[in-house]
């Protein structure tokens, strides 16, 4: 299986960071980051997309799993950016865990 080009995650994350710094009233990301419910709105979206992903898996609907997983990952990126957590921190944590599993 060919390796996926995951640079899209960095590009999307960079756009989210830009929206965090530069408000645009037409931007969905800005609306999430500046919602009156604050972080709770982002948490609601992550929860909603998690449930929709679970349901897609339960229904064994490949296209829907891909679609809902994409929504979930997007909203997780918004959550990370809102909490000043970088993708590098996530990659480092995954690398550390991977190395630990290889040793065990």
From Swiss-Prot:
It is found in: Cytoplasm. Pathway: Amino-acid biosynthesis; L-histidine biosynthesis; L-histidine from 5-phospho-alpha-D-ribose 1-diphosphate: step 2/9. Its EC number is 3.6.1.31. Keywords: Amino-acid biosynthesis, ATP-binding, Cytoplasm, Histidine biosynthesis, Hydrolase, Nucleotide-binding. GO terms for cellular component: cytoplasm. CDD domains: NTP-PPase_HisIE_like. It holds the Pfam family PRA-PH. It comes from the Archaea. Belongs to the PRA-PH family. PANTHER family: HISTIDINE BIOSYNTHESIS BIFUNCTIONAL PROTEIN, HISTIDINE BIOSYNTHESIS BIFUNCTIONAL PROTEIN HISIE. This is Phosphoribosyl-ATP pyrophosphatase. It comes from Methanosarcina mazei (strain ATCC BAA-159 / DSM 3647 / Goe1 / Go1 / JCM 11833 / OCM 88). The lineage of its organism: Archaea, Methanobacteriati, Methanobacteriota, Stenosarchaea group, Methanomicrobia. The gene is hisE.
